[in-house]
Amino acid sequence: MGTLSVNQNKLQKRLRRLAGEAITDFNMIEDGDKVMVCLSGGKDSYTMLDILLYLQKVAPIRFEIVAVNMDQKQPGFPEHVLPEYLKSIGVEYHIVEKDTYSVVKEKIPEGKTTCSLCSRLRRGTLYTFADEIGATKMALGHHRDDILETFFLNMFYGGTLKAMPPKLLADDGRNVVIRPLAYCSEKDIEAYSQLKEFPIIPCNLCGSQENLQRQVVKEMLLEWERKSPGRTEIMFRALQNVVPSQLADRNLFDFANLRIDENATPRFLDVMNL
């Protein structure tokens, strides 16, 4: 890649800045960490690795980066692409081989959504491998749009107000998951991926499925953004500005014991009868 144009340079700086802010805000990476960067071969994880490698050079702390890809034995998966790319940039890497593809195809009827089971199987395998190599953090490539889509999916279809946190302690208590791209937009990541000409590997399982609930929500959010530019940013800001007393979850706020404060200063209004 040659010299960047002004706009390309701004894009790169913006992504690096936003990733750095997210890492700082949530204390994602600490001195001495060994960060296992989960690389799928998609635009998001390539961008995450690229930015983390840059931040590793300029950060005031020292941390290791190990790239890990999970070969799920999907038919036609180009096994050579990631090793060749990672060797070319000099990054330590591991390829974890686990035939989750056959399990998913066996358990999920044809035409049904495979994403949930596929994700659980992949996550469990990666958690175990993180333990094996002594990784202290596991970095995933989810971005701002993913987080918002998950929020609306859970609200519309699950009846819960939850999304993807930028930093998460896994259920096993042994893995800390971080999402350095939490503040970055998918639009910027797509543009950066094209700029850097990453060797993208398509997903033959979920990537080709149509009419998924997530795709419906994605299109809804894109339409909102088209009609009201900036709405996505405002909605994401709302996830960082929660007011439990203005919702209805009794576990988050003690509504039952709300009482008049006898010591509160009375407020009197002058009323004019017309």
Swiss-Prot record:
Chief location of this protein within or outside the cell: cytoplasm
Record: residues binding [4Fe-4S] cluster: C115, C118, C206
Q: How is the cofactor bound?
A: Binds 1 [4Fe-4S] cluster per subunit. The cluster is chelated by three Cys residues, the fourth Fe has a free coordination site that may bind a sulfur atom transferred from the persulfide of IscS.
* InterPro entries per record: Rossmann-like_a/b/a_fold, TilS/TtcA_N, tRNA_Cyd_32_2_STrfase, tRNA_thiolation_TtcA_Ctu1
Highest taxon of the lineage:
Bacteria
Q: Which GO terms describe its cellular component?
A: cytosol
PP-loop motif (motif): residue ranges: 40-45
Q: What keywords were assigned to this record?
A: 4Fe-4S, ATP-binding, Cytoplasm, Iron, Iron-sulfur, Magnesium, Metal-binding, Nucleotide-binding, RNA-binding, Transferase, tRNA processing, tRNA-binding
Question: Which NCBIfam families does UniProt cross-reference here?
Answer: PRK10696.1 (NF007972)
Q: How does it associate, per the subunit comment?
A: Homodimer.
Q: Which family does it belong to?
A: Belongs to the TtcA family.
Record PANTHER family: AMINOTRAN_5 DOMAIN-CONTAINING PROTEIN, SULFURTRANSFERASE-RELATED
Function of the protein: Catalyzes the ATP-dependent 2-thiolation of cytidine in position 32 of tRNA, to form 2-thiocytidine (s(2)C32). The sulfur atoms are provided by the cysteine/cysteine desulfurase (IscS) system.
* Protein name per its UniProtKB record: tRNA-cytidine(32) 2-sulfurtransferase
The source organism is Pseudomonas aeruginosa (strain ATCC 15692 / DSM 22644 / CIP 104116 / JCM 14847 / LMG 12228 / 1C / PRS 101 / PAO1)
Read off the lineage from the record. Bacteria, Pseudomonadati, Pseudomonadota, Gammaproteobacteria, Pseudomonadales
